Amino acid sequence: MLALDGGGIRGLVTLGILEKIEKLVKGKTGGKLCDYFDYIAGTSTGAIIAAGLSRGLTTADLIEFYTSSGKQMFDPAWLLERIKYLYTADPLKAQLQDVFGRDTNLEPDNLKCLFLAVTKNVTTDSPWPISSNPDAKYNDPARKDCNLRIPLWQLVRASTAAPVYFPPEVVQWDPTDQSKTFVFVDGGVTPYNNPAFLLYKMATEPAYRLNWKKGEDNLLIISIGTGAAESLGATATRPNKNIVSTVAGLPGELMYGIQVDQDVNCRTIGRCTFGAHLDREITDLVPRQLREGMTLEEQYAAPSVPLSTNLGRHFLYARYNADLSDAGLKTLGFPQVDTASVQKMDAVGNIPILLEIGRAAAQAVKTDHFGSFP
């Protein structure tokens, strides 16, 4: 399974990492990513990439889409509209329709593997993860509000409707029932901007009607971010900041914290084979070969337990991301890049460098992290 974070134009970081995975997979199986992964999930920009991969596109196809259309997707709204949002949705809609088709929906014949997009239903004030699983309760073709009939482009647009940046997306399920028309915004404002743990639940929880078997030999989840950097917080250096400045910084802080929490969920329920250190207490949560009397530093540096030793976790898990802090960018080979500029969701002027940052981060990807999965 493959889970892709949200992050606006920073989806190019994701693609830089995916490019490496695609090469490794092709070398082992000869197929595309949709042939290797059975289920691909995405939130916001991750939903664009996940939908493209599920349709059979390559990373080269999607890199071309982002590099050629990225600036048009962030087309400034008219002056009066900017009271509500910064960018008009029309160019993005047109680009999504061009790539996915106006009438392509979630029916199984249209996708090469299972697909999941995370959205936020404003009408019901709840996260709405919508999948192409044909056995799911709300994917029954007999229902007038069957999810499988939603146009793929519109579902992706709903998942990318970031508040402040873009207007919401209105989706009509049943034209004869007004109560089946809902307003959606970006899935990144739910707890699932990193959809990896949600993907695990939707694949294994019986209520979602897939019921895949758990276990290190049965499930592998690869989770990919769009780049991240720790923040000191809205009031860390200026505890008496005004309320407007404080509130403005809260969404980013909350999203980062929730993203890390979902990552920790996966590393504790699953078996982490690779991931960055999370903090000084739990480090990377990769199971290691420890012996009595080791110092903390020695424990952190100890070799990992071989994957041939089954530890009874629910799945194997690898998390790849790029550290966009000053120190992280320097380590990746980009000391001249301004960290604040590349962290912005709409940093379309940094399209080339974001892709290169992703490619540099991809050097960490190894097939050893994938265990026994071919």
Role assignments for model-derived ranges:
Residues 1-374:
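Patatin-like phospholipase
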